[in-house]
Swiss-Prot record:
Cross-referenced InterPro entries: aa-tRNA-synt_IIb, aa-tRNA-synth_II, aa-tRNA-synth_II/BPL/LPL, Anticodon-bd, Anticodon-bd_dom_sf, Pro-tRNA-ligase_IIa, Pro-tRNA-synth_IIa_bac-type, Pro-tRNA-Synthase_IIa_type1
Quaternary structure and partners: Homodimer.
Its job: Catalyzes the attachment of proline to tRNA(Pro) in a two-step reaction: proline is first activated by ATP to form Pro-AMP and then transferred to the acceptor end of tRNA(Pro). As ProRS can inadvertently accommodate and process non-cognate amino acids such as alanine and cysteine, to avoid such errors it has two additional distinct editing activities against alanine. One activity is designated as 'pretransfer' editing and involves the tRNA(Pro)-independent hydrolysis of activated Ala-AMP.
Compartment(s) where it occurs, according to its Swiss-Prot or TrEMBL record: Cytoplasm
Principal location class: cytoplasm
Protein name: Proline--tRNA ligase
Entry-linked CDD domains: ProRS_anticodon_short (cd00861), ProRS_core_prok (cd00779)
Catalysed reaction, written as an equation: tRNA(Pro) + L-proline + ATP = L-prolyl-tRNA(Pro) + AMP + diphosphate
Catalytic EC class: ligase
One of the record's GO cellular component terms: cytosol
Alphabetically ordered keywords of this record: Aminoacyl-tRNA synthetase, ATP-binding, Cytoplasm, Ligase, Nucleotide-binding, Protein biosynthesis
GO biological process, one term: prolyl-tRNA aminoacylation
Cystine pairs: none
Length: 590
């Protein structure tokens, strides 16, 4: 039976929702696909469910072809497994916490590693049961501080999460590649451009980690890529350290008066005025060592200040810092932090003063001093002297100051060398649509998932984790497939195959439209039929364009002669032809 608009639950809107930030949010609400319930929480209406179901069907088909089996877990899970793996604390405020009437702690699951691991532990005990890959498509929950952009960053979202279980690392490599290949097929069928980038595993843990990013200007992620094929999320980018330099012939450090120069820009200006370079070049921000104080909050609640030294032409990238210091939280030091550490002279912080080392666990301040990988033995710097209005010139790393370790927190810039030697990188924006991890034995170790191997010895199972953001994909498809009139869905995920519009006021238009619907359904096409009798053609046309079914068949003025108009929403073509030819054309293109 066709879906008739006279009795379909649908209401389109002429005005954009006030809170819409991106095109997909605006059009999905206006066209009647979703409806906001709370910040980051949406109701799914019939049209939206149809598109979502088609995306899920493609995912299921490709995962089944890769040998995965579908299961379904509850969203409400007990605290204990997450506490055992440490994620109850690691996720922090991002978890939705609940208590039952007896006071027991529960959560709304952000991901299900623990549940999958315990299920396999309960049921499997031998290497003969492996390899195994199981998945679910289910709603997830994260208490986003600032949900935004409609479905792109919500508190409730639908996700496909799959997990592989193998007795050996070699087996994990095979399972991982099978899922990676399946992802490529899924995104190709959905018509999504994607880039596979090296990524950080974050709170998920594990070793090998890759993201599938859809390049888009509204993307939340910055990634880098080189002409030679290197690609990585900025959080996973590895800085190429320059070679160490000899100390011989380098002058001793000198402390200079640099009043009113607490910023890098002011320092460079003063340096070029007071102490021009002997080689005739000008001092730049890259010649200065910026020392930034960061505050770390550890899982036990303790707060630690660390000082990070990096070239002055670089800013601290907080996302990279969060990865570098995980699982601790990271923020800039506050005025109270500086007040509690008078040895740090704000605006003039440096690792060395006339009295000797200042920073480092063995120095007077006792603060850890970590440096960027570009700070190598023999490199000379202009940096703070830990005295108001004073900087030290010619301070040489490895000779005049040491550090407690290196850290990757500096921003990545276009032109930085790729770590694999494939050339300079460029920066781009993208939105994560899929993520594959080799979790290894983190969760199996924590939860005791072992099997007997072929020698009768207990071995810990090694795992992979594979996620796809279903609702995010739907939003991205909407974001990339629209025009000034409304949505234009790709045929693979469109809510219907054909949208038939009875546009005339005479009964003959409705009679011919009924014939068209019957013939289209007879050849297996899924039809949305606008049979509303008291709605003007203009309103019907507007709704058809807004809803975005890519092929529209209009029955109007030519109905009495058996002619209809075929619209190609994507190409913009309108063709008048006999009904039989229109049905044949729609059948051929399906």
């Amino acid at each position: 039976m066709p879906t008739r608009l006279t009795n379909y639950f649908l209401r389109t809107l002429r005005e954009d929702p006030a809170d819409a930030e991106v095109t997909s949010h605006r059009l999905l609400v206006r066209a009647g696909y979703i409806r906001r319930q709370a910040p980051g929480v949406f109701a799914w209406l019939p049209l939206g469910l149809r598109v979502k179901a088609k995306i899920e069907r493609i995912i299921r088909e490709e995962l089944a072809a890769a040998g995965a089996h579908e299961v379904h877990f509850p969203a409400l899970l007990p605290r204990e497994p997450y506490e055992i793996t440490g994620r109850w604390e690691e996720y922090g405020d991002a978890l939705f916490h609940l208590k039952d009437r007896k006071g027991a702690d529960y959560l709304l699951a952000p991901t299900h590693e623990e549940a999958f691991t315990l299920l396999v532990k309960d049921l499997y005990s031998s290497y003969k049961d492996l390899p195994l890959t199981i998945f679910q498509i289910q709603d997830k929950y994260r208490d986003e501080a600032r949900p935004r952009a409609g479905l792109l960053r919500g508190r409730e979202f639908t996700m496909k999460d799959a997990y592989s279980f193998d007795a050996t690392d070699a087996g994990l490599d095979v399972s991982y590649q099978a899922q990676r290949d399946a992802y490529e097929r899924i995104f190709a069928r959905l018509g999504l451009d994607f880039v596979i980038v090296q990524a950080d595993a974050g709170a998920m843990g594990g070793s090998r980690s890759e993201e599938f990013l859809h390049p888009t200007p509204i993307g939340e992620d910055t990634f880098v890529r080189s002409a030679g094929g290197y690609a990585a999320n900025v959080e996973a980018f590895t800085t190429v350290a320059p070679p160490a330099r000899p100390f011989e012939g380098l002058p001793s450090p000198e402390v200079h008066d640099t009043p009113n120069a607490p910023t890098i820009q002011a320092l460079v200006e003063v340096a070029n005025e007071q102490s021009p370079r002997p080689d005739g070049r000008v001092w730049t921000a890259a010649d200065t060592l910026k020392n930034v104080v960061l505050a770390l909050t550890h899982l036990d609640g303790t707060r630690e200040l660390v000082v990070v030294g990096l070239p002055g032409d670089r800013e601290v990238d907080l996302k990279r810092a969060e990865v570098a210091f995980a699982p601790a939280g990271v923020e800039a030091a506050t005025e109270d932090d500086f007040a509690a550490n008078p040895g740090l002279v704000k605006g003039y912080i440096g690792p060395w003063s006339a009295g000797g080392p200042v920073l480092g666990e063995e120095a007077a301040t006792g603060l850890r001093f970590l440096v960027d990988l570009r700070v190598v033995d023999g490199s000379g710097w202009i940096t703070g002297a830990n005295l108001p209005g004073k900087h030290v010139f010619g301070l040489v790393a490895g000779r005049d100051f040491d550090w407690d370790g290196t850290v990757e927190v500096a921003e990545v810039k276009a032109g930085d060398p790729a770590p694999d030697g494939s050339g300079p990188v460029e920066l781009a924006r993208g939105m994560e649509i899929g993520h594959v991890f080799q979790l290894g034995r983190k969760y199996a170790d924590a939860l005791g998932l072992t099997v007997l191997d072929e020698n009768g010895k207990l071995v810990t199972v090694t795992m992979g984790s594979y996620g796809i953001g279903v609702t995010r994909i739907l939003a991205i498809i909407a974001e990339e497939n629209n025009d000034d009139k409304g949505l234009v869905w790709p045929e693979a995920v469109a809510p219907f195959d054909v949208h038939v519009v009875a546009a005339g006021r005479e009964q003959v238009a409705f009679d011919v439209a009924e014939q068209a619907v019957a013939q289209l359904e007879a050849v297996g096409l899924d039809v949305l039929y606008d049979d509303r009798p008291k709605v003007s053609p203009g309103v019907k046309f507007g709704d058809a364009e807004l809803i975005g079914v890519p092929r529209v068949l209009v029955v109007g003025r030519g109905a009495a002669q058996g002619e209809v108009e075929l619209w190609d929403r994507r190409g913009g073509n309108h063709t008048t032809l006999p009904l039989s030819e229109a049905v044949a054309a729609l059948t051929t293109s399906s």
